[in-house]
């Protein structure tokens, strides 16, 4: 059979985030870990590393998160611009500078929508931090902001992976 089906959305895993000072890894190790979820792909993970427990989301839970975030009112122009934006930093900066005010607004609206989707996914998936019951509100208290954004992005990457591929991954 060519199609793969997730057998259950009742899966949960413990993960760490790579901005944790108790986690040491290279960019390549970080990328491998985010793809696999296997702690062995990271360089060094100390016992003091913060562990996050997340559960897989069913297709309907993922869709509900998108709807709550505003899927039906998001900017389609912003979505198209987001998809078509260049990947290089300087090239993207010049491209963004050349956008009209309406296009910049549409792109900003779409980026805000994506942030809301990520927050809703974490709200529905995060169950524990360090073995204690947790919520997305605790993630929003992480400082500095760069770490908070990294934690959200990495949680979402793991949530999407286990929700779509199961714990074993690819």
How would you label these PLM feature ranges?
Residues 1-13:
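Short, intrinsically disordered N-terminal pre-domain segments
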């Amino acid at each position: 059979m060519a199609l793969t089906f997730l057998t259950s959305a009742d899966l949960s895993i413990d993960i760490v985030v790579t901005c944790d000072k108790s986690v040491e890894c290279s960019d390549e190790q970080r990328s491998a870990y985010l793809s696999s979820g296997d702690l062995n792909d990271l360089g060094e993970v100390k016992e003091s590393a913060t562990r996050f427990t997340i559960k897989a989301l069913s297709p309907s839970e993922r869709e509900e998160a998108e709807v709550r975030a505003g899927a039906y009112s998001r900017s389609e122009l912003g979505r198209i611009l987001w998809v078509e934006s260049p990947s290089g930093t300087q090239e993207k900066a010049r491209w963004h500078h050349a956008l009209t005010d309406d296009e910049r607004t549409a792109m900003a609206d779409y980026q805000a929508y994506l942030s809301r989707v990520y927050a809703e996914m974490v709200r529905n998936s995060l169950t524990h931090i360090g073995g204690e019951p947790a919520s997305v509100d605790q993630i929003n208290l992480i400082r500095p902001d760069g770490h908070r954004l990294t934690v959200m992005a990495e949680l979402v990457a793991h949530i999407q992976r286990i929700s779509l591929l199961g714990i074993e991954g690819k």
